[in-house]
Regions:
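Charge-rich amphipathic alpha-helical interaction elements
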Residues: 1-108
Length: 108
């Protein structure tokens, strides 16, 4: 009977841990989407900067400044993405361990 109580508690913990894992995955997907948007902005800015159109040439200094900011933001996003990937892995590992412990508690 005591094993059943422990198993129920661990099952609830596993459920919560899986929710945390899904939350971490959602945050990671949002970061990946932002990275793609920044990469698209970088491509657009590079195209405008290398354009021979006189209008774009007038704004070359502004484009260069924007490109610098975009590269900086891109590096920040990459670091954030790596941290979130580690968090997803850590949350998944915790959930797997709790699931194993729950299975062991059921056997008792």
């Amino acid at each position: 009977m005591a094993g059943n109580k422990k198993s129920d508690k661990l099952r609830r913990l596993v459920d919560v841990q899986r929710q945390l894992e899904k939350l971490a995955e959602f945050e990671l997907s949002t970061t990946v989407q932002r990275k793609a948007e920044i990469d698209q902005s970088i491509d657009t800015t590079v195209d405008a900067l290398s354009s021979t159109d006189p209008v774009h040439q007038q704004f070359s200094k502004n484009y260069a400044d924007r490109l610098t900011r975009l590269f900086s933001r891109s590096q920040q996003i990459v670091a954030q993405q790596k941290a979130q990937e580690q968090r997803v892995l850590r949350e998944k590992t915790k959930g797997d361990r709790l699931e194993e412990r729950m299975g062991d508690a059921k056997e008792l």
